[in-house]
Design a protein with these regions (language model features):
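Alpha/beta-hydrolase fold catalytic core
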Residues: 1-32, 53-56, 95-97, 245, ...
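Active-site loop/oxyanion-hole signature of alpha/beta-hydrolase fold enzymes
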Residues: 16, 59-102, 268
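Conserved HGGG/HGGXW glycine-rich cap/lid loop of the alpha/beta-hydrolase fold
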Residues: 19-68
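Gly/Ala-rich beta-loop-alpha elbow adjacent to hydrolase catalytic centers
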Residues: 102, 106, 110
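Flexible "cap/lid" loop of the alpha/beta hydrolase fold
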Residues: 115, 122-153
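Helix-loop "lid/cap" segments that line or gate small-molecule binding pockets
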Residues: 158-173, 180-186, 197-204
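Conserved serine/cysteine hydrolase catalytic core
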Residues: 188-242, 253
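Catalytic active-site module of serine/aspartate enzymes centered on a nucleophile-bearing elbow/loop
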Residues: 247-277
Length: 277
């Protein structure tokens, strides 16, 4: 499962609240914080980071429980907990404010961070983001229910199955980054347990709790959505746009993984967002 595609930057780590959080950082300029979803990692941004790093300070962390970050079984790994950890990461990297872009559950982290700590967010970008009660998707709900049984199966089974499902519509180079994201789950019982804990933490109550507060966001916001997204249906996109004052929306010819499927278009959208004030 090793990828031939190198990451856009080598991983470094920060110690935050007793946790080791891995991140990739490249470039100089105004900070852009890129947040991945499930079951990916900072490798989601392999084809977005290099271009943006030509003009920006690009930071892509592995959320707790993902990638090369710690995978604790005794800590809260919900999207709210992830959002609460982001200011500490920004402090460690000496970043006051950033343009924050989140994909999938990373979009929930970005929404919650913007609502709770608006002084840390200069602009908000949401890419095929979970929102309101759009999640967990049925496949993840089924996996949550089956977690006790899945936990007894050979560890490699779930990651092989995930890879085969998710890579169907991805270009070859994106498949390599997907496999690199999945490869960190080293197919041992401990990492399988950590992955299932991430799945069990998927809970729409976190985004539902801040839905009314989206109307208080007063930074430039932009929503990008794959018009053929099978996991977060495109119907959610205009609802999310309309909930955030002044937000704009762009539908692209893509499935769920726009950063892998249409990286050039996404880079253009992020650059346009970063130019707004």
């Amino acid at each position: 499962m090793n990828s031939r595609m190198p990451p856009f930057a080598e991983a470094a780590t920060a110690d935050l609240d007793g946790l080791t959080v891995a991140y990739r950082r490249a470039g100089q300029g105004e900070p852009i914080l890129l947040l991945h979803g499930i079951p990916t990692s900072s490798r989601l941004w392999d084809f977005v980071g290099p271009d943006l790093a030509g003009d920006f300070d690009v930071i892509a962390p592995d959320l707790v429980g993902y990638g090369r970050s710690d995978k604790p079984l005794d800590r809260d790994v919900s999207v709210s907990a992830q959002a609460d950890l982001m200011p500490a990461l920004m402090d460690a990297l000496r970043i006051d404010r950033a343009t924050v872009v989140g994909h999938d559950i990373g979009g929930a982290v970005a929404q919650i961070l913007t609502v709770r700590r608006p002084e840390r967010v200069a602009r908000l970008g949401l890419v095929d983001s979970v929102c309101f009660d759009s999640w967990p998707i049925p496949q993840m709900t089924a996996l949550k229910r089956a977690a006790p049984l899945v936990g007894k199966l050979p560890p490699g089974w779930i990651f092989t199955a995930l890879g085969s499902v998710l890579e169907r519509d991805l270009p070859e180079r994106a498949r390599e980054s997907l496999q690199a994201s999945l490869a960190v789950w080293d197919r041992s019982p401990d990492t399988l347990a950590a992955f299932l804990r991430n799945v069990e933490a998927l809970d729409s109550s976190h985004t539902e709790a801040i839905s009314a507060d989206l109307g208080k966001i007063d930074v430039p916001a932009h929503v990008v959505w794959g018009a053929a997204d099978p996991f977060q249906r495109p119907e959610w996109a205009p609802r999310l746009r309309d909930a955030i004052p002044g937000a704009t929306l762009r539908l692209v010819d893509s499935g769920h993984f726009v950063p892998w499927e249409r990286p050039d278009e996404l880079v253009a959208e992020i650059r346009a967002l970063a130019a707004r004030s």
